[in-house]
UniProtKB/Swiss-Prot annotation:
Residues 91-104, 127-144 have a biased composition (Polar residues). One of its GO terms (cellular component) is synaptic vesicle membrane. May be involved in Ca(2+)-dependent exocytosis of secretory vesicles through Ca(2+) and phospholipid binding to the C2 domain or may serve as Ca(2+) sensors in the process of vesicular trafficking and exocytosis. The keyword Hydrolase does not apply. Ca(2+) 1 binds at D251, D257, D309, F310, D311. It comes from Rattus norvegicus (Rat). Residues 91-147 are annotated as: Disordered. The chain crosses the membrane at residues 53-73. This is Synaptotagmin-9. Binds 3 Ca(2+) ions per subunit. The ions are bound to the C2 domains.
Length: 491
């Protein structure tokens, strides 16, 4: 019976307590008994109670953290934009207060005169000319706000009065009376008159051009402006490339990185190149180049301009070319002549890639075909330095399959390499009619892949000179037959 047992235990405890109080038992035993009773009377925490209290503490901490994060996010989303909106509206009101517009008749009169007059100049320090987006108003500094405030705040083209005819005639007489080709004076005048001036070619559509004959053509790739002059004392042809306009876009951004190469044909060893102008379709070069040539030889020479789009990671794209001949019909030497020429689109078939000279020799008894790569000339420049690192690769082909291939050594930094290297293939007489040779002039690139400058073929399946050269080799066995071959684009 649990109740009788508890009562019995309770009586025993009372008896022991009385004995301890009377001193009938030892003091140490009584102290142990008292401590034991005190421990039994003290409440004990159970394990489930401890786990519940810890869980409550963790949940409380997480709740406080989430509450703090929600307060921070709400402050960022609500308070900060509201404050910025208030500041922006205040500044906008302040900016709109000083705007003063003239009468309607005055505005209409000014708008009608915008396309007839050049613009009013502003200080150099207070403006930044944009060649790519002419419709955006110019940004001024605080020092130039008084002079250019109207041009900044009102998106309308303001022009300056045109110079009088008397001034133009005086300037023309001064230029014609001076036989010297003063480049610095031309550049200084262009800088003074070009600041803040609206360029008409940026605003005109390609179907509407001025009276200078600059009409767009379906195959034209813009126009090139240059100046020609002949120096009789030094016997030099002076060429100044001024600018190009309306070039086609070659990059994904809608712009190009143009530069110009110049040759005085038929000499390709003397080559000049302008600087690369980044991200523009209307580059201004203003560079002068000299070509030593006798005056009597000008009639037989041709001035060749090639406009390229610079590409840092791949082959440069040819935009177009300009060829100038019959100098005496175009220019009144020794006086300077300003010319505008259309940049003509050039297909791959018309690109001059250079020429390769090699000889062919076949020994029927030994069944040995020898091709000797002699030299190349006027190769196309593939590097940014204006040169190439060419080598020649020869492949023995049969029914479209390459049987063997050989290559020459690489000549560094040249467009006119000399090889004099022989390459031998074993070809039996019964197979000589089924094979042909594919010759490729390559540009060695240390970093990327090697690029093909041009190719040519010889054999029964070749065209024109390639077939004739092969037939001549078979007609004269054991005799080297050499010819120059023009390089073509790889198809």
């Amino acid at each position: 019976m649990p109740g009788a047992r508890d009562a019995l235990c309770h009586q025993a405890l009372q008896l022991l307590a009385e004995l301890c109080a009377r001193g009938a038992l030892e003091h140490d035993s009584c102290q142990d008994f008292i401590y034991h009773l005190r421990d039994r009377a003290r409440p004990r925490l159970r394990d489930p109670d401890i786990s519940v209290s810890l869980l409550t503490l963790v949940v409380t901490a997480c709740g406080l953290a989430l509450f703090g994060v929600s307060l921070f996010v709400s402050w960022k989303l609500c308070w900060v934009p509201w404050r910025e909106r208030g500041l922006f509206s205040g500044s906008k009101d302040n900016n709109q207060e000083p705007l003063n517009y003239t009468d309607t008749e005055t505005n209409e009169q000014e708008n009608s005169e915008d396309f007839l007059d050049p613009p009013t100049p502003c200080p150099d320090s207070s403006m930044k000319i944009s060649h790519t987006s002419p419709d955006i108003p110019l940004s001024t500094q605080p020092g130039g706000q008084d002079n250019c405030a109207h041009a900044v705040r009102v998106q309308r083209q303001v022009t300056e009065p045109t110079p009088s005819a008397r001034h133009n005639s005086i300037r023309r007489q001064l230029n014609l009376s001076n036989p010297d080709f003063n480049i610095q004076q031309l550049q200084r005048q262009e800088q003074l008159t070009g600041i803040g001036r609206i360029k008409p070619e940026l605003y005109k559509q390609r179907s509407l051009d001025n009276d200078d004959g600059r009409r767009s053509n379906s195959k034209a790739c813009g126009k090139l402006n240059f100046i020609l002059k002949y120096d009789c004392d030094l016997e030099q042809l002076i060429v100044k490339i001024h600018k190009a306009v309306n070039l086609p876009a070659k990059d994904f951004s809608g712009t190009s990185d143009p530069y110009v190469k110049i040759y005085l044909l038929p000499d390709r060893k003397t080559k000049h190149q302008t600087k690369v102008h980044r991200k523009t379709l209307n580059p201004v070069f203003d560079e002068v180049f000299l070509f030593p040539v006798h005056y009597n030889d000008l009639e037989a020479r041709k001035l060749h301009f090639s406009v390229y789009d610079f590409d840092r990671f791949s082959r440069h794209d040819l935009i177009g070319q300009v060829v100038v001949d019959h100098f005496f019909d175009l220019a009144d030497f020794p006086r300077e002549c300003i010319l505008w020429k259309d940049i003509e689109y050039v297909t791959n078939d018309n690109v001059d890639l250079g020429e390769l000279m090699f000889s062919l020799c076949y020994l029927p008894t030994a069944g040995r075909l020898t091709i000797t790569i002699i030299k190349a000339r006027n190769l196309k420049a593939m590097d940014i330095t204006g040169a190439s690192d060419p080598y020649v690769k020869v492949s023995l082909m049969c029914d479209g399959r390459r049987l063997k291939k050989r290559k020459t050594s690489t000549k560094r930094n040249t467009l006119n390499p000399v090889y004099n290297e022989a390459i031998v293939f074993d070809v039996p007489p019964e197979s000589i009619d089924q094979i042909h040779l594919s010759i490729a002039v390559m540009d060695y690139d240390r970093v990327g892949h090697n690029e093909v400058i041009g190719v040519c073929q010889v054999g029964n399946e070749a065209e024109r000179l390639g077939r004739d050269h092969w037939s001549e080799m078979l007609s004269y066995p054991r005799k080297p037959i050499a010819h120059w071959h023009s390089l073509l684009e790889k198809r």
